[in-house]
Structures are given as C-alpha cells and as structure tokens.
C-alpha cells in the first residue's frame, strides 16, 4: 500500500490510520490540510466534533455511545501529507488521481477524481436526504456543518464531468441524471431545513434552543428514528450560524443553553 487518503475527520473514516501505519509502515497517510488536527488526534476529534454541543447547548452522547465513538479510533497518528485541493497523485504511468476540496461536512473534506474513468470518490461530501441502513431504512439525518461550503460542493459535483460517483454511505451512482438527482436531493434538503428553521424561530418569538429545534423539526425533515433527532445539531447549528452571519438570526450567548431569535432587523422587516 503506497497511499491512504483520508477524506475527512470521523472515526469511521480516520479511526484506523494508526493501524494502517502499523501494518504498512511505508504508507503515505494524507488528509485535508484544514482537518489535520482532528485526524491526527482522536481526543481532539472527539471534543471538537462529537462533544461540540455540550457546553453551550447541553447536547451530548450518553457514556456508552461516547465510548463506542472513541473506540472507533486506535491511537494518535501523524499524517505524512496534507492537501488543499488541486494536487494530483500519479499511481502509474496512465493513472492519475486529482485531489478535490469538497468542504461542508468538514472544512478540509477531500474527494478523489479519476479523470480517465470519470469517477469521483466523494466520501461524505454530499448526503442527499440522509443516511440509510444496508436494509434501506432511514437511519440518520444529513450531517453537514458549513452550509455555504456544502452548497458549493454540491454545485462542484453537479457541474463536473463525473459519470460515476462513489460515496461511503450511499449507493454508487452511474450516469449524469442519477448524479444530478442526488445533487438536487442534497440541495433540496438544505433549502427545506433552512425554511423550517426560520419558520420555527419566527413562530417562537421568546426564543428557541438548538435542542428544541432538533427535537421539534426532526419529523418534518426526515424519516430517521426519533432517537437520533439530536444528530440534527450538526446541520441545524450550521444553518443558525449562517443566519446569524447574514443578520437573520440573533443569539443570546449569556443564556445556557444558547437561545436563538429572529434578529431585530428581521422582525422590523
């Protein structure tokens, strides 16, 4: 094994890097430059990505689930290279892979494009309307975090000349129409979620919490089990951050948990 390119920082994608290095000492480990800190440190990955909503929102995993998440990673492991997008890997005389930057699910999320076969390996870069189990049942909501970047990634894939795209939790998609439909499904979820969040905040003038938005909007946004409703914290927090930046929402950070409202300018409008 010459290369192991890690698409993004989640335990099921980077947790085995130390074991890969142990088994294949010569391997070059690589990841997105903006994700390096989390990928190299399981402790930082857990605190920044999986325990991110504890202090300000009172949302966190129960001890057993938290331990299961930690168990996905073996030990800390440095990477050899980081990529920012635009690089190429030559695997053979006629085999070149392009490194694409596909942020949204993480800041440094990478994709690998095999131009000779018009095949994109996109990891978790776009997520349709959520995750399904191998039995075809809805199991989890979309878990993007950075809305504008995620929408740009959808556009990037949609506009590419890829004719086959391979993700990590979704069926392989063949042909322009299938790819276009999945991109549209991914974008439509974002639009629908943003609308629902805005309407809910508008209808609750005294303010709402992130937990409340997750539990109250879960059934309106998808068919995954109610037990995983709080996983919406990832996407919804991204929409809230974007709304605050755009002046649509305001946040009271003196409250614990944080409370969100329409901004004064939005209410006046």
Task: Briefly describe each language-model feature range.
Residues 38-43, 130-134, 197:
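Short, charged, surface-exposed secondary-structure boundary motifs
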Residues 195-269:
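C-terminal regulatory/interaction regions
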């Amino acid at each position: 094994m010459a290369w192991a390119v890690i698409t993004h920082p989640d335990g099921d994608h980077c947790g085995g890097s130390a074991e890969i290095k142990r088994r294949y000492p010569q391997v070059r480990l690589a990841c997105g430059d903006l994700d390096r800190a989390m990928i190299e440190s399981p402790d930082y990955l857990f605190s920044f990505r999986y325990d991110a909503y504890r202090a300000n929102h009172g949302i966190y995993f129960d001890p057993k689930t938290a331990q299961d998440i930690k168990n996905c990673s073996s030990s800390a492991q440095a990477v050899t290279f980081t990529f920012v997008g635009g690089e190429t890997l030559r695997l053979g005389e006629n085999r070149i892979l392009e490194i694409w930057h596909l942020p949204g699910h993480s800041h440094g999320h990478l994709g690998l494009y095999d131009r000779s076969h018009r095949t994109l390996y996109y990891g978790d870069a776009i997520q349709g309307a959520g995750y399904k189990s191998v039995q075809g049942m809805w199991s989890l909501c979309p878990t993007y975090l950075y809305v504008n970047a995620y929408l740009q990634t959808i556009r990037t894939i949609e506009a590419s000349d890829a004719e086959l795209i391979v993700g990590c939790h979704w069926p392989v998609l063949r042909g322009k129409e299938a790819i276009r439909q999945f991109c549209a499904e991914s974008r439509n979820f974002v639009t629908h979620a943003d609308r629902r969040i805005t309407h809910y905040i508008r209808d609750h003038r005294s303010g709402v919490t992130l937990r409340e938005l997750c539990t109250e909007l879960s059934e309106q946004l998808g068919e995954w089990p109610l037990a995983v409703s709080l996983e919406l914290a990832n996407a919804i927090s991204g929409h809230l951050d974007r709304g605050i930046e755009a002046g649509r929402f305001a946040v009271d950070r003196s409250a614990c948990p944080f409370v969100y409202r329409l901004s004064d300018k939005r209410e006046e409008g």
